């Protein structure tokens, strides 16, 4: 893809649909330094529109659309990323967040309730609410030493371990069991 060694790579993996708000990432790309590439991995009904927006915003030199990739290649794309970026506020399960973290890729995501238990600001990523916050997070990343970046990547992996499918299933099970216990308790008192 012609990515240079000294370039910072932001990677997005997922379906290209309007509700994913990828257009925001393209808009912000106008404001970032020229040594940052945005790699958009995936396909979907909104891809053509996004490619047109990239031209309109004059960011085609710094944005790469990979198209659909096979599931066994996805990990490779996470690995080229310095940060995983997402502007979506419509995630319910957020598997791509987990995949990025598992690959040691810190997150830079639009603030979303589904991430409040996942993102620890400045430790495994950041959440932003607007363009200035987005740019501020990028500046922090750029100012980190290699050791700080390594620590952040390691924390990302530990976070993914904590939120793996197994631990997610156990958390859901605890919630259901607590709900059943509460229901039982209420039925006892109702009788």
Give the ranges of each region predicted by the language model.
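A charged, aromatic-enriched C-terminal amphipathic alpha-helix characteristic of glycosyltransferases
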Residues: 150-185
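A conserved mid-protein helix/loop that constitutes part of the nucleotide-sugar donor-binding site
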Residues: 8-31, 36-38, 45-51
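Short hydrophobic beta-strand element within catalytic cores of glycosyltransferases
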Residues: 106-109
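Aromatic "clamp/platform" in nucleotide-sugar-dependent glycosyltransferases that forms part
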Residues: 89
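Short alpha-helical segment that forms part of, or immediately flanks, the ligand-binding pocket
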Residues: 75, 93, 97-102, 116-117
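Nucleotide-activated donor-binding/catalytic signature segment of Leloir-type glycosyltransferases, i.e.
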Residues: 51-69
């Amino acid at each position: 893809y012609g990515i240079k060694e000294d370039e910072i790579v932001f990677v997005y993996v997922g379906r290209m649909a309007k509700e994913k708000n990828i257009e925001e990432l393209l808009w912000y790309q106008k404001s970032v330094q020229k040594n940052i590439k945005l790699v958009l991995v995936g396909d979907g009904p909104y891809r053509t529109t996004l490619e047109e927006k990239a031209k309109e915003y004059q960011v085609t030199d710094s944005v790469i659309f990979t198209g659909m990739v096979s599931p066994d290649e996805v990990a490779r794309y996470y690995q080229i990323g310095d940060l995983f970026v997402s502007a979506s506020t419509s995630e319910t399960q957020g598997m791509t967040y987990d995949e990025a973290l598992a690959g040691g890729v810190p997150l830079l995501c639009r603030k979303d309730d589904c991430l409040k238990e996942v993102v620890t600001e400045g430790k495994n990523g950041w959440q932003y609410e607007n363009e200035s916050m987005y740019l501020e997070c990028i500046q922090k990343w750029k100012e980190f030493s290699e050791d700080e970046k390594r620590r952040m990547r390691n924390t990302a992996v530990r976070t993914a371990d904590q939120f793996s499918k197994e631990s997610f299933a156990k958390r859901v099970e605890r919630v259901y069991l607590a709900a059943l216990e509460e229901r039982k308790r209420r039925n006892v008192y109702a009788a």
